[in-house]
Amino acid sequence: VLNQRDELILREKYPFVGHTTRIPIALPDRGTSIQQTTELTRKKPTCLFLGSYFAPNNQGILWFVEHVLPYVDIHMKIVGRGMSKLKDESPALRDIEVVSDAPDLLPHLQDADIVVLPIFSGSGMKVKTCESLMYGKNIIGTPEAFEGYDIDYSLVGGNCKTAQDFIECIKNFTQNPRPRFNEYARKTYLQKYSLDAIKQSFKTIL
């Protein structure tokens, strides 16, 4: 299973299941392509939401735009397959930069000061969280976005349960700039969520 939550669900549905092992999500390393800049986050940070046109993503970003965006001074950017459709459907996104079906995500990740992940539903572990770690990004997300990840939220960015949490976390970045390249995030990916790391986990159970 990917995480403790999945294990509990599995045992609830199939009480006869014996021993289980948690093996988290892993991705091949593409993070070497990003520039490991020493620049600090900008006073008006670019906050990037990565996600395709999909109900949990749509719900999350629309919530963020309504409950967080009016109270912070940021440049908001939404990048994801089919997200132009959401912009057409949602007047709230009218003045927000939306890039749909981008051929390459790297320039958008490179430019972002912070990746925001306001995700409230789903299962397993979120791929975009792993990708953001891989590219060494500052990440501000919900408990659902971080479900199953073993990380220090204060070092990676912030774990936000409410709109006010998001607002305060973003304002902390604007008042106390951090490196745009988050070495802790990158290191966490390499040690725990890279293919090499997961291979070691499999070796321990075989």
Regions found by a protein language model. Give the residues of each.
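Conserved catalytic-core segment of nucleotide-activated headgroup transferases in glycan assembly
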Residues: E12, T21-D111
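Short Ser/Thr-rich beta->loop micro-motif in glycosyltransferases that lines
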Residues: S100, L117-S123, E144
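Short hydrophobic beta-strand element within catalytic cores of glycosyltransferases
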Residues: I114, K128-M134, N138-T142
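Conserved acidic donor-binding loop of glycosyltransferase catalytic domains
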Residues: M125, G141-P143, K161
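Short acidic/histidine- and often glycine-rich active-site loop of Leloir-type glycosyltransferases
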Residues: P143-N159
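A charged, aromatic-enriched C-terminal amphipathic alpha-helix characteristic of glycosyltransferases
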Residues: P177-L206
